Structure formats: C-alpha cells, structure tokens
Amino acid sequence: MLPPIKVKVGEPIVIQLEDNPSTGFNVCLTEMPQGIALADVSYLPGQALPGMVGVPGTRRFTFIALAPCEGPLLFNQIKFTHPEPTVQEPTPMENRFVIVES
C-alpha cells in the first residue's frame, strides 16, 4: 500500500494513472472524500512511433482540498459493456488515501 497523500485546505492534489482507451477500458473515479472537489480530468497521449496504435497514455485527475477530511481516492478501470459494465479491481496506484488538514 502506498503512503497517504497529505495536503492542506486549498492545495491541489494531482493523480496521474496509466490509461489505454484503445482497450475499451477507461480509468474512472469511483470514490472520494467529501472535502475534496474534482477540478479537472485530462488525457495525455503516450509517445508512439509512426504507425503504432494502442499506445497507453496518462489520465490526469486534479482535485482541490476544500475542507479537512480523510478517506480513499479510488479509481477503477471500467469497460462500459452491455448489459453490465466490466469493472477491474484497482491497482495500488488506483487506490490512494488522502488526508486534508486545516
């Protein structure tokens, strides 16, 4: 298990996770503490040689700590299939614990 992320109210929290949408799976935020707000989500494509497809990139989640709190920031790889989505168990990088202090 990774050490907790400790921040103060008003500070940003940035989590970067490998993501490869070409597989049909996407990294999705599935749980976060109430004192944290999701401010931005972006995707940074990976470096690929000409002609390469399916190269993983990075999904970047930016949060702002709004109030003292603690709890998990949980992400899952989800493939939105029919009739039920396929949800993979989180890796250690996708299962973080955050402590926000005043």
What is the role of each PLM region?
Residues 1-102:
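Extracytoplasmic soluble-region selector
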